[in-house]
């Protein structure tokens, strides 16, 4: 219970022989009643609001993570109708009022040329079948190159790229990297290597409005994905790091490197 407010007054000195008794006089009572009552300052509301905001943000992030994890489970059987990258490109075209046509067709992995599968693995993630979502050797080498100021390689695996394409788009931030890192093991555990490769090849951006192996092969070479040969597969794989700036016919040097990697890997 709150304590009653105390009322203080000045001391009344009573000398011997005076007629005044040792009691409060009427004037002192009036003075005390008319004195302003001082209340203690109220604690800042910031101290109460801030923890609630932090808890609310944390709960929202956890909820979004759970939704993404459930979507990964569903992708074990359901082909993705779209991705964050697809929606991002649609939004950018709408904002800038530029024409946009999406080419996207999901096909089974069995209908994608083995040469194209091997070329993409050789170009993007040579240890795809050895790691569990993170290529620590490539991460270490990339970090070393960062320290030396000569970064020439990326360290993202196919699984990491798939998670980014599905849920986060092309933006970069520490928050996105952290969320991506927690979802990669889920994707590896739930989907498995074959399904990860299948979804990646079918949703990855291969040019302006071009998504997936089938659309890329028909857009650049006029042939279905099942009929692509080694050389054209290497050229298609060569544009993946920068699909909006590169063209297959200009990637002879890099595609030759990819072909050598394929031979070294036994393909």
Regions found by a protein language model. Give the residues of each.
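Juxtamembrane regions of bacterial inner-membrane/periplasmic proteins
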Residues: 2-15, 20-267
């Amino acid at each position: 219970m709150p304590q009653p407010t105390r009322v203080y007054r000045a001391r009344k000195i009573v000398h011997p022989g005076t007629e005044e008794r040792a009691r409060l006089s009427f004037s002192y009572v009036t003075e005390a009643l008319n004195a302003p009552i001082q209340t203690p300052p109220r604690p800042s509301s910031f101290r109460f609001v801030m923890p609630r905001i932090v808890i609310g943000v944390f709960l929202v992030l956890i909820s979004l993570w759970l939704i993404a994890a459930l979507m990964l489970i569903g992708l074990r059987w359901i082909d993705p109708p779209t991705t964050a990258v697809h929606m991002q490109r649609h939004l950018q075209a709408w904002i800038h009022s530029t024409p946009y046509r999406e080419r996207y067709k999901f096909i089974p992995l069995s209908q994608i040329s083995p040469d194209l599968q091997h070329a993409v693995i050789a170009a993007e993630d040579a240890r795809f079948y050895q790691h569990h979502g993170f290529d620590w050797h490539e991460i270490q080498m990339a970090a070393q190159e960062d320290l030396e100021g000569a970064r020439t390689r990326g360290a993202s695996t196919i699984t990491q790229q798939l998670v980014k394409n599905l849920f986060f788009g092309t933006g970069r931030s520490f928050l996105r990297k952290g969320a991506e890192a927690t979802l990669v093991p889920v994707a590896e555990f739930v989907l498995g290597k074959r399904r990860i490769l299948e979804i990646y090849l079918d949703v990855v951006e291969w040019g302006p409005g071009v998504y997936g192996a089938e659309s890329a092969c028909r857009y650049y070479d006029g042939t279905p994905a099942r009929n692509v040969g080694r050389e054209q597969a290497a050229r298609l794989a060569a544009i993946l790091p920068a699909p909006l700036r590169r063209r297959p016919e200009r990637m002879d040097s890099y595609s030759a490197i990819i072909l050598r990697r394929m031979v070294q890997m036994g393909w």
